Amino acid sequence: MSERNQRKVYQGRVVSDKMDKTITVVVETYKKHSLYGKRVKYSKKFKAHDENNQAKIGDIVKIMETRPLSATKRFRLVEVVEEAVII
């Protein structure tokens, strides 16, 4: 297996695009509670590199793990899966 295929890929929603070439993506996951068995939702925010500033707030995007690009950026934008509907 090649090294690129072992990188983590997440799908999440853009919650901030105010920074230049950087977006904040919230990724929601569900885990089962060990004792009670109920599904519990967890969310985590990641900063991702957006070279062309193409992602906007509310978009569903796919991000991939990469080398550290700054103090907090460890992901890069792969694609915009679904664009947000602006009303």
Swiss-Prot record:
GO biological process: translation
InterPro entries: NA-bd_OB-fold, Ribosomal_uS17, Ribosomal_uS17_bact/chlr, Ribosomal_uS17_CS
Keyword Transferase among UniProt keywords: no
Gene designation per UniProt: rpsQ
Known partners and oligomeric status: Part of the 30S ribosomal subunit.
A single GO cellular-component term on record: cytosolic small ribosomal subunit
Cysteines joined through disulfide linkages: none
Listed HAMAP family: Ribosomal_uS17_B
Keywords from the named record: Ribonucleoprotein, Ribosomal protein, RNA-binding, rRNA-binding
Lineage: Bacteria, Bacillati, Bacillota, Bacilli, Bacillales
Protein origin, superkingdom: Bacteria
PROSITE patterns in the cross-refs: RIBOSOMAL_S17 (PS00056)
Organism: Bacillus licheniformis (strain ATCC 14580 / DSM 13 / JCM 2505 / CCUG 7422 / NBRC 12200 / NCIMB 9375 / NCTC 10341 / NRRL NRS-1264 / Gibson 46)
Functional note: One of the primary rRNA binding proteins, it binds specifically to the 5'-end of 16S ribosomal RNA.
GO molecular function: rRNA binding; structural constituent of ribosome
Name this polypeptide is given: Small ribosomal subunit protein uS17
PANTHER family in alphabetical order: 40S RIBOSOMAL PROTEIN S11 FAMILY MEMBER, SMALL RIBOSOMAL SUBUNIT PROTEIN US17M
Family the entry assigns: Belongs to the universal ribosomal protein uS17 family.
The keyword DNA repair belongs to this UniProt entry's keyword annotation: no
